[in-house]
C-alpha cells in the first residue's frame, strides 16, 4: 500500500503473506475503535486495544482456545487477567470467568462464575480471594465457596458459604455433612 516512507510500507511476499513493519499499528474503524500493534521492542507482544473480542463458531464443541507452549522446561502457559487501574482498592474485582448459556425459555443465564477480588490492597500486606458462584433454583448466582488469604503468613481459609447442614453445603463422598461449625 502507498506510503510516503518506504520503511512504513505494508507489503505482500511471494507466498501471499502480508507483512507489516515492526512497531506499527493496524487500525480498524474510522475512529480507530480497535487497534492491533506488534511491539517488537519488548517481548514481541501483539497488543489488541478495544473493547470486546468474540470468537464464534456454530460447530459442536467449538471454538477451542488453545495456548500452546512447546518449551521443554517445567513451566506451562498462563492466562493472565490483569486489572491495572490507577487506584486499586479493597473489594475491587480483579477478574471473572463467567459460564453463560440459555435456559429452556432462551433467556441468557450465567450458570457459574469464578471471581477474584482484593481483600487487602496495602503494599506488603496484600490479600486476595477467589470466589466460586453457581446458579441455584431460580437462576440467582450465589457464592458457594470462598478461598481467602489472611493477614498471617501462609494462612488461607476455605469457606463453604452456603453450608446449612440440611440441604446445602459441604459434601464428603457425596454425603452432606450435617454438622455446622460453632
Question: Which residue stretches match the model-derived regions?
Answer:
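Extended, low-complexity, turn-rich repeat/linker tracts enriched in Gly/Pro/Ser/Thr and Asp/Glu
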Residues: 105, 119-122
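Short Gly/Ser/Thr-biased coil->beta-strand turn/linker motifs
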Residues: 5-28, 33-35, 43-102, 109-116, ...
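Beta-strand-rich solenoid/repeat architectures in extracellular/passenger domains
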Residues: 1-3
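Short beta-strand
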Residues: 38
